């Protein structure tokens, strides 16, 4: 009886929220409804985009934006080390990838956008789940995947320029493979910050012997599994289920772990506009979608190392 009562109460609560949400739109209070949905989307996007875990985004004010000398394309000029090479992540609508070798480099802004979600307003009122959560789930996956895909493709382009030094090829997932990758960064005078890999590859750490990770860690893996672990050899690990973005799933040639220097050595992540929900109404039909204007710059191409493992 208690369980049934709880379920019924939750459903009524969700329907009440949805009715209020829809009425705000139909009563002309669209900005309020957009603000509610935007808060959900931004919170979830921070959790879903691994690019945002590696480089923390910074919101730019209007007066911090720089003008391009040839176009109306917004950009941000950033100082960099004179002996380093820099580039930026080319999002939709931004300039083509450029390699900068001077004292400064430009970060150009593009656009990420979700698919459009269209529904009759009366049907929305019958939903048994919070419509704001449904909208955020639909929007966030699209936008986070766009950020992560463009970020990873840029890192791979950097590695491709210096395969002999910025790619470590390993026969199996073991401490020696990562040691060589760590040493490659350190030998270039770059500190070690974070490791990115898929959760599938991360589970290989369960086979690491106690002689590699220590008895306490091996025991913890046995009792709690790898999900309880946030680091390997003291290095924070960002793990993701996005195998199609991180690994070469097309040619099935590699599974990869990316080693990055800390953010102040690696690059910048600017936002002209963070993820924002837009709502459009035409009679009884409501259309929802989200968009953002990010710009990611890699200020030092030496600050990343890719460790490749055989496909499995």
Q: Which residues fall in each region the model found?
A:
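Assembly/oligomerization interface modules of large self-assembling protein complexes
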Residues: 39-113
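Generic detection of short hydrophobic beta-strand segments and adjacent strand-loop junctions
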Residues: 67, 115-117, 307
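Sequence/fold signature of self-assembling virion shell proteins
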Residues: 3-6, 23-31, 212-312
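Extended, solvent-exposed, turn-rich assembly/linker loops in the middle of proteins
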Residues: 157-231
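Residues in well-ordered beta-strands of folded domains
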Residues: 106-108, 116-118, 196, 238, ...
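Alpha-helical scaffold segments that mediate packing/assembly in large oligomeric complexes
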Residues: 114-188, 311-312
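N-terminal alpha-helical "arm" segments
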Residues: 1-49
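Short, structured interface segments that constitute the first stable element of a domain
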Residues: 1-18, 104-121, 203, 207-233
């Amino acid at each position: 009886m208690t369980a049934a009562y709880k379920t019924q109460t939750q459903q009524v609560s969700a329907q009440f929220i949805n009715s209020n949400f829809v009425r705000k739109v139909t009563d002309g209070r669209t900005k309020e409804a957009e603000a509610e949905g935007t808060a959900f989307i931004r919170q979830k996007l921070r959790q879903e985009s691994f690019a945002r875990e590696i480089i923390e985004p910074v919101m730019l004010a209007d007066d911090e934006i720089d003008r391009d000398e040839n176009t109306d394309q917004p950009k941000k000029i950033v100082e960099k080390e004179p002996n380093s090479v820099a580039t930026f992540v080319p999002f939709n609508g931004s300039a083509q990838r450029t390699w900068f070798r001077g004292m400064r480099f430009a970060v150009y802004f593009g656009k990420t956008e979700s698919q459009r979600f269209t529904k009759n307003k009366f049907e929305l009122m019958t939903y048994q789940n919070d419509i704001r959560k449904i909208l955020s789930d639909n929007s966030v996956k699209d936008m986070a995947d766009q950020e992560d895909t463009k970020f990873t493709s840029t890192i791979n382009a950097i590695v491709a320029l210096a395969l002999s030094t910025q790619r470590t090829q390993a026969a199996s997932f073991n401490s020696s493979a990562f040691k060589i990758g760590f040493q490659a960064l350190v030998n270039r005078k770059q500190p070690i910050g974070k490791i990115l890999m898929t959760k599938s590859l991360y589970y290989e750490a369960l086979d690491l012997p106690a002689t590699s990770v220590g008895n306490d860690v091996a025991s913890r893996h046995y009792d709690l599994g790898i999900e309880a672990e946030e680091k390997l050899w003291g290095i924070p690990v960002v793990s993701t289920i996005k195998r199609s973005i991180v690994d070469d799933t097309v040619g099935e040639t590699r599974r990869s772990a990316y080693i990055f220097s800390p953010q102040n050595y690696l690059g910048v992540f600017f936002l002209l506009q963070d993820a924002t929900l837009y709502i459009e109404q035409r009679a009884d039909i409501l259309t929802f979608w989200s968009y953002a204007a990010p710009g990611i710059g890699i200020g030092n191409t030496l600050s990343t190392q890719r460790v490749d493992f055989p496909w499995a």
